[in-house]
Amino acid sequence: MYSPIRKSHPLLKMMSGSFSDLPSPSNFSIWWNFGSLLGLCLVIQILSGLFLSMHYTSHVDLAFSSVAHIGRDVNYGWLLRSIHANGASFFFMCLYCHIGRGMYYMSYFFMETWNVGVVIFFLTMGTAFVGYVLPWGQMSFWGATVITNLASAIPYIGEILVQWVWGGFSVDNATLTRFFSFHFLFPFMIAGLSMVHLLFLHQTGSNNPLGLNSDCDKIPFHWFYSTKDIAGFLVFFFVFFIVVLLYPNGFTDPENFIPANPLVTPVHIQPEWYFLFAYAILRSIPNKLGGVVSLVASIAILFCLPLTISLMKFRSLVFYPLNQILFWSFCSIFLLLTWIGMRPVEDPYIFIGQILTVLYFSYFLLNPLILKFWDNLY
């Protein structure tokens, strides 16, 4: 009896086992679509970035002009640039939803998968940061200066490290050139780590909304979830191209339409919106080293979540009403921190940012304690 070629060919068999014939829980919700959407975003960013790199010039005298040239003279260059710039924003929207789903449904039970995912998160933030420097506008230059200068807070090696990153004594041509190289390299590293992420996920099997063992109730990924993913892609493209075609500069800082000038400081230096929550936490600490530690800890604390798995009976917040309230409060805190990051450094925004920073980190302390309390209650 003949078997389908996808089950007999060595390469197709491996791909089929990872996608087409993958046994999946039968009760996935819409929140499980964001993983495939992230893969789609990564492909969009790599392809659009590849074509943009063919026309971009990584030199301080030409970078800003080359970006203007792409928008004005290159066939559909304006579309490529809009897709790439807004694609980054949509990438982070999907990423935050994906992480939020993992926290709500306790996907950190799969420790290797979760930790690789957090590494991908760090690498994605690094990719976005070095990419933001490339247009060489005012916010690009001053954002690079401020953020890279934070490394000088590291004891003993800080100053040397900053000069090593800059390639000199200030943000200049050497900095721009190496940032362009990093921005080209990192997405392929993210793609490789995504394969590792999927490898670990397929070793353990996926979580599900109830957090229960679903070995007795699995269905093949294709057609059931492939069609669901395609439906998600269609909705994504609909919203994405509304932004790309009608509001191409909606997520862009107006300061970045001014060429970089080391002699003129912008009124309010801020990163892109997807870094603002971490930037607000950084600003809330009056000490420079403390601010840098808090900035890194705001994301690195995700590594600590798998350490709490021994404290709970169930593997989903569906069974923990108090923790559901706490989780959605945490989401509100995240959004408020993003808003605070846009505000000038003055009262009452400084004080509000400090309160929100304390509440942000308090979630990671209170959540396991309330989980344990609820388990003991019933």
From Swiss-Prot:
GO cellular component assignments: mitochondrial inner membrane; respiratory chain complex III
Binding site for a ubiquinone: H202
Cofactor(s) needed by this chain: heme b
UniProt topology in membrane: Multi-pass membrane protein
GO molecular function: metal ion binding; ubiquinol-cytochrome-c reductase activity
Compartment list: Mitochondrion inner membrane
GO biological process per UniProt: mitochondrial electron transport, ubiquinol to cytochrome c
Keyword Transmembrane helix listed: yes
Residue numbers binding heme b b562: H84, H183
Note accompanying the cofactor annotation: Binds 2 heme b groups non-covalently.
Membrane-crossing residue ranges in chain numbering: 34-54, 78-100, 113-133, 179-199, 225-245, 289-306, 313-342, 350-369
Domain of life: Eukaryota
Main location: mitochondrion
InterPro entries: Cyt_b/b6_C (IPR005798), Cyt_b/b6_C_sf (IPR036150), Cyt_b/b6_N (IPR005797), Cytb/b6-like_sf (IPR027387), Cytochrome_b (IPR030689), Cytochrome_b_C_euk/bac (IPR048260), Cytochrome_b_N_euk/bac (IPR048259), Di-haem_cyt_TM (IPR016174)
Keywords of this entry: Electron transport, Heme, Iron, Membrane, Metal-binding, Mitochondrion, Mitochondrion inner membrane, Respiratory chain, Transmembrane, Transmembrane helix, Transport, Ubiquinone
Residues that bind heme b b566: H98, H197
Its job: Component of the ubiquinol-cytochrome c reductase complex (complex III or cytochrome b-c1 complex) that is part of the mitochondrial respiratory chain. The b-c1 complex mediates electron transfer from ubiquinol to cytochrome c. Contributes to the generation of a proton gradient across the mitochondrial membrane that is then used for ATP synthesis.
Subunit field text: The main subunits of complex b-c1 are: cytochrome b, cytochrome c1 and the Rieske protein.
Name of the protein this chain belongs to: Cytochrome b
Organism of provenance: Loxocorone allax (Goblet worm)
Organism taxonomic ancestry: Eukaryota, Metazoa, Spiralia, Lophotrochozoa, Entoprocta
